[in-house]
Amino acid sequence: MAASVAAAAGRLRRAIGRSCPWQRFSTEPHPPHGAAVRDAFLSFFRDRHGHRLVPSASVRPRGDPSLLFVNAGMNQFKPIFLGTVDPRSEMAGFRRVANSQKCVRAGGRHNDLEDVGRDLSHHTFFEMLGNWAFGGEYFKKEACSMAWELLTQVYGIPEDRLWVSYFSGDSKTGLDPDLETRDIWLSLGVPASRVLSFGLQENFWEMGDTGPCGPCTEIHYDLAGGMGPPQLVELWNLVFMQHYREADGSLHLLPQQHVDTGMGLERLVAVLQGKHSTYDTDLFSPLLDAIHQSCRVPPYSGRVGAADEGRIDTAYRVVADHIRTLSVCIADGVSPGMSGAPLVLRRILRRAVRYSTEVLQAPPGFLGNLVPVVVATLGAAYPELQKNSVKVLIWEIANLVSEDEAAFLASLQRGRRIIDRTVKRLGPSDLFPAEVAWSLSLSGNLGIPLDLVQLMLEEKGVKLDTAGLEQLAQKEAQHRAQQAEAAQEEGLCLDVHALEELHRQGIPTTDDSPKYNYSLRPNGDYEFGLCEAQVLQLYSETGTAVASVGEGQRCGLLLDRTNFYAEQGGQASDRGYLIRTGQQDVLFPVARAQVCGGFILHEAMAPECLQVGDRVQLYVDKAWRMGCMVKHTATHLLNWALRQTLGPTTEQRGSHLNPERLRFDVATQTPLTTEQLRTVESYVQEAVGQDKPVYMEEVPLAHTARIPGLRSLDEVYPDPVRVVSVGVPVAQALAPASQAALQTSVELCCGTHLLSTGAVGDLVIIGDRQLVKGITRLLAITGEQAQQAREVGQSLSQEVEVASERLSRGSRDLLEAHRLSKDIGRLIEFTESAVIPQWQRQEQQTTLKMLQRRANTAIRKLEKSQATEKSQELLKRHSEGPLIVDTVSAQSLSVLVKVVRQLCKQAPSMSVLLLSPQPTGSVLCACQVAQGATPTFTAEAWALAVCSHMGGKAWGSPVIAQGTGHTADLEAALRTARAYALNQL
C-alpha cells in the first residue's frame, strides 16, 4: 500500500507543479508534509472555488452549554444553521467558507479519551478540514464534485481506491433515498459497485434531538487497494442540511439548504503518506522523537495489544496525543480545573503524567518540555499558540503543564506508597478499602483519578471494594448538593463542655494567621506558604476526645496553628490535606475547618493511626482556595457597586460564597430593576478591568470608627480588625479627611482575598429574589463562568429576535403558528433556568411573554376563522335532519371543537359529530348533542362509542366531548356514529 500511495503522492506533486498555482506541496521527493496537506485543502477551496477562509474557533464552545469542547468544524456555524446569527455580524455574510478546526473529543457524547493509546487511530485532539455552503450557495452536485476533484486531482488519490456511500432512505420517517447524490457520484465516474447505500444511522446526520439535519454522503478509502477484500476507512463526510427535526420528531424541509463537510486531517495525511497509523505521520513524528530523546525507552514502533510489551508504544501515543490537547486547550483559555471541561482536561493531564512517569520513565518537567514541539508543528496553522497575549505564551503553557505535572507526580508517589502499605496488610481475598481509594482520588484531594487507582490495583492483582466506593460517591454527591447553598451538612463541633475542658487543660486557641501567608508571583500565579503544626487534641466522629484515631475513622483535629480558613464571614472553609512530618506517604484529607470559640477544628479522614502530639504539615487545596478568594473579592466589589447604584445607605444583610458562586443579601425597598442590575455589573466590570490592588491590614478596631462610609456588618469584630481596601492603601483610608470608603470598597473582613481585582475576570448576577419584604438575595458567578453566561445570554437574545421576526411576518398556516408558539414556550422555559445575566433574563422574559400573548392571539384568530369557514361549509351540506355526522379538515383538536360549537350554535336542534383525519394517521373526534336531547344521549358516550371503534379514547361531558383514534376506514366510523345517535334519538 505504501508504495502505491507514495506513487500517487508523486503524481499529485507533479500535477500541482504543472497546473495548480493555488498551492504547492513540498518539493521533497517523499509524500507531502501534513502542513502541506492542510494548506492544499485551504488553498484549493479559496483559490479554485472562491471560499472564504475563516480561522479555527476556540476549542472552548462559545455560548453553547451543551458542549464541553468544540468537537466538529460546524460548531462555530451553529447560529447560521439555527437561524440565530446576528444579522449585523460578520458571520451573517458567510456564503461559502472553509477552514481547519481544532477539535477535542474527550467528554460528553463524543468521548475518545479511554481509547487513546490502545489503538492506532483514536485522538482526543484532531484537526477537522471542512468546507461549507450556506443558504443554498451550492449544494450536492458542487460539493461532491469539489470533493472528488480535490481527492483525485489535487491529492492524487487513485480513483479505484475510493468508495462512496449515500442515504438509502427510511420508510418509517417517510424519507426517500438520496438518489440525487447517488447519480452525482455515478456521473463523476464512480462505478456502481463502489457506490453503497446505508440507513439513518450511517448516512443521515443530525445536530441533536432537534434542529437542522439531512442526508450525508461519505467518501471512504480502501486500505487494501485491490489486495484482498476492501478495508475501508472514512475520509470525508459531506452533510446536506435540508431538513429540520422538530421536537415532536417530525421532519420538515428547511427554507435554506446548507452544505457541511468534515475530513480529519490526521487520517488524510496517513493515507497520503502511505501510513497505516496516524501516529506514523509527520504530524506526530516530531513529538514521538522528542519523547524518545527525553526518556530511557526504545523508539516508538507502533505496537498494540499483547505485542506492546510494557505498554511502551501505548504510552508514546497517550503522551503525544494528550500534550497536543493540553497545549491547544490551555492556549484557548481552558485550564485544568475542578469541574466541566477543566476537570476533563485535568484528567487528561494526569493520565499523561502517569504514562510518562510509570511507563516511559520520563524526568520531571518532561511534559512541559514537549509544548514547544507542539507549537512548532501547529503554531503556523493556529497562531494563538504563539501570540504574545494573555495565557497563550509558550512558556506560560509549559509552566502550567509543568506545575500540575510536578504536583501530580508527588501525588502519584504518595499514592503508590499508600497502596503498597495498604496491600501488605490485606489478606488473600480482602478487597482494597474504599475509604483509602477515595482518599487517593480527585474527591479525596490527592487528585488521582479513580480509574488510575483501579488500574494500579489491577496491576497488583488486588480488587477494589467498588460497592463501598459507590456508597462514598453517593454520599459525596449528596454532600455537594447540600453545599450548593450556605448550609453545609452538620459536622463535628465543640460544645460548651468541650471548650471548657480545653481551657481547663490549658490548650491554647488556634493561631490561624498562616492562612494569610500567600503571595503573588510575577507570572500572576499565587503561592501559598507551608504550615507545620502539632496535634493538640483529637475527637472521634461522635465528638468524644480521644488520644488517637485509627484507620478509616472520621475525626476532628485541633492544632496549635493552621493555614486553613475556617468557615466564617460567609466564606466557605478551606479544603486540603495534612501529612505527618517524616511520613510523606500518609495523606489525611481535610474536608472542612470550622472555628469554635477560637479553636479551629479540622474534619479529616484518617487512612491510618494519628495521635495527639504528632507533628503535621498542612496543605490547602489551591484551586478551592483561589475560587474562594476570587468570589470574596468579587463580593466586596458587588457590595460597593450596589451602593454606587442604589445609594450610600444601602446595607448588606448577609452573604455566602464558595468557588462555584456567591450569594449576597441586600436591604432594598423594592426589587432591583433590570437597569439597576445592569448598572451594578458595569461598576464591578470597571473595577475588575482596572486591576486595582487590594490592600489588607490589621488596625485597632477603634480607628475604623472614623472611616466615613465604612462597609461593616452588625456583628462582633476582633480587635485589631482586618481592613480590606480596594485601590486605596489602608493607611490612606484611615486618614481623618479621607473619603476613600465613599469612592471605593473598604470593609472590615477576616476572609482571604485576591491581591488585585483583575483576577476576578468578570461578574454576572444570575439570579435575584425577594427573601422577605425589603431584602433581596442576589446570586452571582465570576471568571469564565461569567463570560460563558454572557455568551449564552447573547445567543438567547438572537433566538428571541428570530422568534419575533417570525411572528411579525405572520402566517395563515395554523400548524406554523402552533410551532412558533411552542418555540416561544421552549424559549420561555430555557430563559427561566439558563445561567445568564439576570438583567437579560428579565428583559427576555418580558419580551417572550409579549410574544407568547401575540402568538396565542394569532392562533385563536386562525382557529376561529377556520372554524367559521368549516361550519358554514358543513351547514350548506346538512341543512336538514337531526344529525350532522361528517368529516372535516382541521389542523388541531381545538379547531375541530370550535367547528362543532359553531354548528350547534347556528343549528341548536342538531347533534353534531365530526371526524378529522390527520397526516400522522390519527383521527380526531369532537361532538355535541342538541339541546333537549334525551337524557341517555350524552356527548361523552357518543364520542366513546366512535373512538373505541377506532381503537382510541374519548373524554368530555354530557353536552360536548372529544377524542382520538386510528382507522383506515372512516366510512365505517361514520356509520358507527350515525347508528349510535339514531338509536338514542
UniProtKB/Swiss-Prot annotation:
Residues 1-23 form a transit peptide. Its EC number is 6.1.1.7, 6.-.-.-. L-alanine binds at N237, D260. Keywords: Aminoacyl-tRNA synthetase, ATP-binding, Ligase, Metal-binding, Mitochondrion, Nucleotide-binding, Protein biosynthesis, RNA-binding, Transit peptide, tRNA-binding, Zinc. GO terms for molecular function: alanine-tRNA ligase activity; aminoacyl-tRNA deacylase activity; ATP binding; peptide lactyltransferase (ATP-dependent) activity; tRNA binding; zinc ion binding. Its main location: mitochondrion. GO terms for biological process: alanyl-tRNA aminoacylation; mitochondrial alanyl-tRNA aminoacylation; negative regulation of cGAS/STING signaling pathway. SUPFAM superfamilies: Class II aaRS and biotin synthetases (SSF55681), Putative anticodon-binding domain of alanyl-tRNA synthetase (AlaRS) (SSF101353), ThrRS/AlaRS common domain (SSF55186), Translation proteins (SSF50447). It catalyses: tRNA(Ala) + L-alanine + ATP = L-alanyl-tRNA(Ala) + AMP + diphosphate; (S)-lactate + ATP + H(+) = (S)-lactoyl-AMP + diphosphate; (S)-lactoyl-AMP + L-lysyl-[protein] = N(6)-[(S)-lactoyl]-L-lysyl-[protein] + AMP + 2 H(+). Zn(2+) binds at H632, H636, C749, H753. It is found in: Mitochondrion. It comes from the Eukaryota. GO terms for cellular component: mitochondrion. Binds 1 zinc ion per subunit. Pfam families: tRNA-synt_2c, tRNA_SAD. It is an enzyme of class 6 (ligase). Its cofactor is Zn(2+). Monomer. Belongs to the class-II aminoacyl-tRNA synthetase family. Catalyzes the attachment of alanine to tRNA(Ala) in a two-step reaction: alanine is first activated by ATP to form Ala-AMP and then transferred to the acceptor end of tRNA(Ala). Also edits incorrectly charged tRNA(Ala) via its editing domain. In presence of high levels of lactate, also acts as a protein lactyltransferase that mediates lactylation of lysine residues in target proteins, such as CGAS. Acts as an inhibitor of cGAS/STING signaling by catalyzing lactylation of CGAS, preventing the formation of liquid-like droplets in which CGAS is activated. Consists of three domains; the N-terminal catalytic domain, the editing domain and the C-terminal C-Ala domain. The editing domain removes incorrectly charged amino acids, while the C-Ala domain, along with tRNA(Ala), serves as a bridge to cooperatively bring together the editing and aminoacylation centers thus stimulating deacylation of misacylated tRNAs. This is Alanine--tRNA ligase, mitochondrial. It comes from Rattus norvegicus. The lineage of its organism: Eukaryota, Metazoa, Chordata, Craniata, Vertebrata. The gene is Aars2.
